[in-house]
Amino acid sequence: MESLVAICDTFISSIDDSGVGHVDDCVAGYFSASASQTGTPDRVARLMSERLHHPKKWILRAGLWLLSTWIGSLVLCGWRSFTGEFPYFRRFCRLPEKRREEILLNWSSSYFSLLRMLFRTIKLISALVFFTQVDEKGRNLAWKAIGYNGPSPDHSDHEVELNEEKKKKKPEEIFGPLYNGIVDLKSPREAVEKKLAGRGFAVSNQKRNTNGSSISDPVMKIQCDAVVVGSGSGGGVAAGVLAKAGYKVLVIESGNYYARSKLSLLEGQAMDDMYLSGGLLATSDTNVVILAGSTVGGGSTINWSASIKTPEHVMKEWAEKSKLEMFGSDLYREAMDVVCKRMGVQCGFVEEGFNNEVLRKGCEKLGLPVKNIPRNAPSDHYCGFCCLGCKKGQKQGTSETWLVDLVESDNGLILPGCQATEVMYDCEQGKKKKATGVAFAFGEEIYVVESRVTIVACGALRTPHLLKRSGLKNSNIGRNLCLHPVVMAWGWFPEEDKWPEKKKKSYEGGIMTAMSSVVIEETHSSYGEMVIQTPALHPGMFSGIIPWTSSKDFKTRMLKFSRTAHIFALLRDKGTGTIDSKTYIDYNLNDEDEESLKNGLERVLKILAAAGAEEIGTHHSEGRSLNVRTASSLEIERFVREESSKPLKDLSGQICSAHQMGSCRMGIRPEESAVRPTGETWEVERLFVADTSVFPTALGVNPMVTVQSIAYCIGLNVVDVLKKKK
């Protein structure tokens, strides 16, 4: 633990007033606070132990252990562990702070990739914890200094409202429209059985063995027409379609349900509660940081509202090249219209937020095309916190739409906090395998759902694992993973009376309202466009991805948080990866994709400069930046060219992914795909997949409308199966 404390205190050290000049009390307090003074190392250790499930986690353990010895410190730190005084070579924690800073900075660009991984991982988690941890009042000592207000009073808990107006409001008005459709398996067994039976589900409780439960001897058996594993944009839509068609549907969700009244909108808590692995997910080489939802509503609960229809050139490609007739059909176009209408998708906004104003102005100055982004939220929804859940319920994710249809039909229920362990199927010799249901775990207890059809919609990162552990052998399961890799650049706009308005903050306003789709001509590719948009970055994620060159520089960068605009370039990647297990995501950026991302980064830097940023930079570990106002046009051009030409595969920059797809792709032959054009698996009848994993290739834009449209069509296919097979 000494080594971890020393590393955290090096990343975030105490800096006295003399080192920062004249500042007000809140800024002075922020600079003087170290990681250990705020309890950061203990929380970092807990996160690493409980949330970080990475195949190379051993590097952290080994590195921290080595640093606890003088010889290990010599191995990892080299001559910098030499002090010139007996005992000459010292453990990392006994070295002067300045020397420790030099060591960490050396790791960030080390020839050895394991040292770069060690630096990147501990830096990201330390920063994330320091800037997201809160006291009993829900505040963080750094927030005022960096200009972050946290959740506004409008987003506060409903305790007062519940106490004063509980007689005036119905429970679903306070807790959300899924209030009556959630089954809490922590409730008494009799209450669970009563709720299931009340919705028409046959329940049997014939457990024989008192020592534990198993698939052959479960705690409970539940019978239904269809069981859906996953409640996101795929599973939620499929479940809603089936329930409205009159079939009994049970939804199994590994994440928990957070009603509107339970949403804190605190970044750290929301990530821990509603993101896969608490937001601590990355490819096997840690080169790509991955964000994915894990809660009722899935990614639609925490995404950024963009609701873009499948591009015409992608539909044409999937229909002609992949020979999937669905994407050239009227049915698919109707499906897109249906899901957009159900989500209330519209393109307008009453007021545009800081980041999007910057993107729009920069594009207009450069003559680049820029347009409004369709969103599943009303035009007056000026909220930058929807990545942490929508407290007002205005963002129309599946928990506000398709899952509501499920609940209101009286044909469906949702079981949150349940981990599907196996898809069950009949396996009679000489006959085709037929799905018969799903086994799932709630804590240590095993339950079984017996169904006529089974739909797996765990998302592109989890569906392959469930299918593989259920015995499916198709070689395409877990392959062809696309990530829509993203690279970002930043621009600092001081608080001045001139544009952009002084009152606006980087974390406020609609997360996505403007976008630019630009063909990267330099790649000579007809594959698609580079999409340029803005992200949602609250202090934790912001601090996790910005460069670190010293503790003082890092804290100074964070002072600019509220007026630093970020813009990213999203790539429709040609290269693909594989998923071998829950934790092993192998993805190597290919050369062509890397060049496209570099070109995208160049364009983003130019947009920020054109928009009027005083300072611009990227997330490269060197931490270079340029004062645009004092630089000549030649200096700006040279800086943009140099920063955008740096390699992206060596862990020196930062690549992110919020969209994962293609890992069980749809096709017309089992040799090249995992599921049929109907969504049914090649190996098991009545087993369907309905999430982004069925995408034939990368999409190139935000995938919510596309996956919902595909799930809608697959849902109709399942209805046909249920009609035929009574």
From Swiss-Prot:
Residue stretches in coiled coil: none
Source taxon at top rank: Eukaryota
Entry binding sites for FAD: 224-239
Enzyme class: oxidoreductase
EC number(s) from the headed UniProt entry: 1.1.3.20
Active site: H659
Membrane topology summary: Single-pass membrane protein
Annotated catalysed reactions: a long-chain primary fatty alcohol + O2 = a long-chain fatty aldehyde + H2O2
Pfam annotation, one family: GMC_oxred_N
Gene Ontology MF: a single term: flavin adenine dinucleotide binding
Family label: Belongs to the GMC oxidoreductase family.
Protein purpose: Long-chain fatty alcohol oxidase involved in the omega-oxidation pathway of lipid degradation.
Name of the protein in its database record: Long-chain-alcohol oxidase FAO4A
Organism: Arabidopsis thaliana (Mouse-ear cress)
